[in-house]
A protein has these predicted regions:
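Divalent metal-coordination and catalytic microenvironments
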Residues: 21, 95, 153, 182, ...
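Hydrophobic alpha-helical transmembrane segments of multi-pass membrane proteins
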Residues: 72, 76-79, 121-128, 202-210
C-alpha cells in the first residue's frame, strides 16, 4: 500500500497509465462508433455464420487463406472488446460485444489447429451461461428503471442489490474468472496457439485483458457510485 501511494504521488503512476493505456483504448473505441447493435446483428453475426460454414468446407479452401483467417477472426474479436470498453450509451451493446468476442476467438482457434468439440464447448459453456444471466439481468433492470446508460455511474446497487450480485457473477463469468469452465477453457485455447504465432497470441491475450476491464466497467457504471436518484441522502464525492 505504501509503495502504491508513493507511485501515485511521486511517480505520477495514474497519469502514466492514463497516457499509455486508458487514452489509447478510448481513442481506438471512438473510431469504432459506427458499431451499433443493428450492424452487429445484421453484418457481424451473418459473417460469423459464414466463417463457421467456411470451417465446414475447410478442405476446399486455399491454404494461403486458411493461414491468415485465425488472425483475422481474432482481430475482429479484439475490435469488439475495444468498442465495448469505450461504449458510453448502451450496456446491451457493450455486453453483447464481450460475449461475441469469445465466439470469434473460438472460431479463430478451430481454423488454427485441430481442436476437439469438447474443448470448444468447455470454453464457451461458461460464456453462454454467464452471458445469458447478465443479459437477463440487464433486461430486468431496464424494465424497472426504463433508462439505463453507462455514460455515468448510476449506483443502482442501492435499490437493486440482488441484480447487482447476479450481474457481478455474470461479469466475472464472461471475463474468465474461475467460477465457470471458461477459466480452464482459456488455457485450452492458448494450448492451440503455436509459440511462433506471436500476432495471434497477442490478439487473443489482449482480448481477454480488455474484455475483463470492459466487463467490470459495465458493472461499475450501472451499480456503483452515487445513486442517480436523489430521494435519499447522498455522500459528497469528497467524502
Amino acid at each position: 500500500n505504501t509503495l502504491y501511494i508513493l507511485a501515485l504521488k511521486e511517480f505520477n503512476l495514474e497519469g502514466f497509465l492514463n497516457l499509455v493505456l486508458w487514452k489509447p483504448l478510448k481513442t481506438i473505441g471512438k473510431l469504432l462508433d459506427f458499431l451499433d447493435i443493428k450492424r452487429v446483428y445484421y453484418f457481424f453475426i451473418p459473417l460469423f455464420v459464414l466463417g463457421f460454414l467456411a470451417y465446414k468446407f475447410k478442405v476446399d479452401l486455399p491454404q494461403q487463406l486458411i493461414s491468415v483467417l485465425p488472425e483475422v477472426f481474432a482481430f475482429i474479436g479484439l475490435v469488439f472488446v475495444f468498442k465495448s470498453f469505450s461504449e458510453r450509451k448502451s450496456p446491451f451493446l457493450a455486453w453483447i460485444l464481450i460475449v461475441l468476442n469469445h465466439f470469434w476467438i473460438a472460431l479463430a482457434i478451430v481454423f488454427n489447429d485441430k481442436v476437439s468439440v469438447s474443448e470448444i464447448a468447455f470454453y464457451l459453456a461458461g460464456i453462454i451461461l454467464a452471458g445469458g444471466i447478465g443479459y437477463i439481468a440487464l433486461l430486468q433492470l431496464k424494465k424497472i428503471e426504463m433508462r439505463i446508460l453507462i455514460s455515468q455511474y448510476l449506483g443502482h446497487v442501492y435499490e437493486h442489490p440482488k441484480f447487482a450480485f447476479f450481474f457481478l457473477l455474470a461479469t466475472l463469468g464472461i471475463t474468465g474468472f474461475p467460477i465457470t469452465s471458461t477459466f480452464i477453457g482459456e488455457d485450452l485455447i492458448f494450448s492451440h496457439i503455436g509459440s511462433n504465432q506471436v500476432i495471434l497470441a497477442f490478439f487473443v491475450a489482449s482480448s481477454f485483458v480488455v474484455s475483463g476491464i470492459a466487463g467490470i466497467r459495465i458493472y461499475a457504471r450501472l451499480f456503483l457510485g452515487p445513486h442517480v436518484k436523489t430521494y435519499h441522502e447522498l455522500p459528497y464525492k469528497s467524502s
